[in-house]
Amino acid sequence: MTSQTSSESQVPVILVATDFSETADSALDWAAELARQQGARLEMVHAVTVPPVLPWYPPPNSLNFSEELRKAAESRLAETRAMLAGKGVEVSTFLDVGTPSQVIVQRAESLAARAIVIGTRGLTGLRHLLLGSTTQRVVHAARCPVLAVHPADAGGHRPIRTILVPTDFSQDAELALTTAHHLLSYLEQDARLILLHAYNLPIEYTAYGPIPTSVSYLEDAGLEAERRLFEMAEALKRDGLTVETVARQGDPAHVIAEEAQKRGADLITMGTHGHSGLRHLFLGSTAERVVEQAPCPVMTIRQPEE
């Protein structure tokens, strides 16, 4: 573990999680660029997870085993830190034993981190369950923005020219738009922002199959979405931003991922919710599905709890 000086504690922190994978290396590149843009210091976090003892294997000496894992992780952190130093990137390190998502979120809260950057493999099935669940848990639990970087983004940070901001016109979406606006202030003047709204039938309608009123409902929803997107875009254009709008019918997560691919988005920023249980199922799952499906990094921003 590393200690903070009083001067360090006054500088904003970008926290990057690593498991020493290729995707984590790409997350490091994105985190370093984000820290450079915002004048923040970079901290690299790794959690040592002691595998559960299986009944058909003799249990190792848990204390020695944990210490061996810790030493190996410290060595890898030192190697990565030296590699980054060779590129002119300064980074502090933090190591702890525990569940990765808990270690990451707790460390971010203790530092009041400006953002967490983490790699996600975007896999399905058992491999996703084992390898991708940490990212999903961090997205759901973190109070600060979380930037999830995908395997397709491996090979380094690329310039951000297009930011896609999905909106459902809620406070969560407004916070994500504010974050995107802030990020654009650090980017080249030719950067653009795309506002996207995906509308669909309420779940109550879909339970009954096709009904006549569904057609007029969708038409009205599309027109209302276009009107509200136009108003939002005009306000942003007055701030000197280049803005485009898209209103489309369909499943939100699918539409967001498809439009990001179609329009060459370099980053998606979107709101998420800190709910649990049934409310999380309906309100938080869209952001988590986008993190899995999107063709580019996704920054999720959680509305502060009242």
Regions found by a protein language model. Name each.
Residues 2-61, 87, 159-213, 235, ...:
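Small/aliphatic-rich secondary-structure junction motif
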Residues 27, 73-76, 176, 225-228, ...:
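Hydrophobic alpha-helical membrane-association signature
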Residues 45, 94-96, 126-129, 149, ...:
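Structural motif
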